[in-house]
């Protein structure tokens, strides 16, 4: 990335209009295995907690993206963290939002195994009014990590132990998973992941990175094949939380990834109440390794 590109990255994109559609809400809910009736209601369905990650479907072209004018190699782009902060109720079908995206900062770090990682803090804000200057209804923050291609002649990654993202996200404080104290509120195992699951989520969310469904493209990055979209399990975890929290609004939902999930992984979702208004969710692969950890704060 050149210095000119880095400077351009801090120019906010043009705002765009997002009309929340009930068909898209139900599609997203089905793609993320939502057990919540309000997500599939015949009238005025409520958006799932991570639904606004689908905002890219409403972008007309590159001028609406915080990445406008910047080249990205999707073979080497990883998702490190994601956070949603809600300052009001979740949008329902028919809500008209004004959306604006910007890159807040970029910085570099050296990986433990060498090579440079470029971290990008991408912020997407949503307003219910036509303006985009006041406090937003929702703020979505993403940490994206660009890594260097593997060295020439390096063997392709394998699905065991499938730790490809760990080095990349070390700089966002990946820690060993320790069971959180508190009340266990759910413990579920989802069916084994398939590439069809990845494609369904990509269609529902607008994340069309071919690394999640195109074998040749995935292998060109050094991976053995397609792997799960990180936000898929994050959305499933959020839906599990919503089913438990009921009508209590969530103020903040934050996710941090540790390892890739692969086709064939039957992920386990364990939610623990860590305080009067706080939860932690650990999502683990069949071998017990952590795929992601999520934290949520409710308003009551």
Spell out what each predicted region is.
Residues 1-81, 153-155, 165-247:
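Hot-dog-fold acyl-thioester-processing enzymes
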Residues 1-3, 81, 85-190, 257-300:
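HotDog/MaoC-like acyl-thioester-processing domains
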Residues 225-228, 232-267, 272-274, 283-286:
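Catalytic-pocket segment enriched in acidic/His residues
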């Amino acid at each position: 990335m050149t210095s000119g590109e880095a400077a351009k990255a801090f120019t906010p994109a043009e705002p765009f209009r997002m009309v929340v559609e009930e068909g898209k809400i139900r599609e997203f809910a089905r793609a993320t295995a939502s057990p919540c009736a309000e997500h599939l209601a015949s009238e005025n369905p409520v958006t799932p907690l991570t639904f606004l990650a689908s905002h890219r479907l409403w972008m007309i072209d590159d001028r609406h993206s915080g990445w406008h004018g910047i080249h990205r190699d999707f073979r080497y782009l990883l998702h490190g963290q994601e956070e949603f902060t809600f300052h009001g109720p979740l949008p329902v079908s028919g809500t008209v939002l004004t959306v604006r995206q910007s890159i807040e900062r970029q910085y570099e770090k050296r990986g433990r195994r060498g090579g440079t990682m470029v971290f990008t803090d991408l912020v997407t804000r949503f307003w219910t009014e036509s303006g985009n200057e006041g406090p937003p209804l929702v703020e979505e923050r993403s940490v994206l990590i660009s890594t260097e291609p593997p060295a020439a002649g390096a063997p392709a990654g394998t699905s065991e132990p499938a730790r490809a993202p760990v080095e990349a996200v070390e700089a966002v404080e990946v820690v060993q998973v320790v069971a959180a104290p508190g009340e266990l509120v759910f413990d579920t195992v989802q069916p084994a992941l398939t590439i069809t699951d990845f494609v369904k989520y990509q269609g529902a969310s607008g994340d069309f990175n071919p690394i999640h469904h195109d074998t040749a493209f995935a292998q060109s990055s050094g991976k053995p094949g397609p792997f799960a979209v990180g936000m898929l399990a994050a959305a499933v975890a959020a839906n599990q939380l919503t089913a438990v929290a009921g009508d209590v609004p969530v103020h903040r939902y934050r996710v941090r990834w540790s390892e890739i999930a692969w086709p064939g992984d039957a992920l386990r979702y364990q939610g623990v109440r860590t305080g009067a208004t706080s939860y932690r969710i650990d999502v683990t692969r069949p071998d017990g390794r952590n795929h992601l950890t999520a934290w949520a704060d409710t308003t009551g």
